[in-house]
Amino acid sequence: MFENVTVKEWMTKNPVTVTPSARISEAHQLMKEKAVRRLPVVSADHSLVGIITIGDVREASPSDATTLSIWELNYLWAQLTVEKIMTRHVRTVTPDTPILDAAQMMLEYKISGLPVVDGGQLAGIVTESDIFRMLVRSRVSTK
């Protein structure tokens, strides 16, 4: 049923992105505002250089067990950039990748989203939610 379906049919085009020099606090705020759990990290020419997830942000957050004051914590947090905690070697797909192959990659590598790269440039992102949306819509259309 989905053998001929490609990523480009279900991916989110022009996803919300962040630059490597952005502060972690800015990336976190952007994730909250846009209700996304991951941000592709792009260079000035829109090439993909990494990805940052809400999990990465949480791991970089100060521990409650720290002995630093709130002011020291806020200062350190404000200095931390996306580049310091992003994943650099990102698994990607192309717009023409079969959607089932993308789903298989997500399962195999235990990741919930894949940046879509076309000609070295970020073209979109495909996530678990996109796959679920495809399944639900196909079920509705076959009733």
What are these language model-derived features?
Residues V36-R37, S43-D45, T66-S69, I111-S112, ...:
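Short, charged/polar low-complexity linear motifs in solvent-exposed/disordered segments
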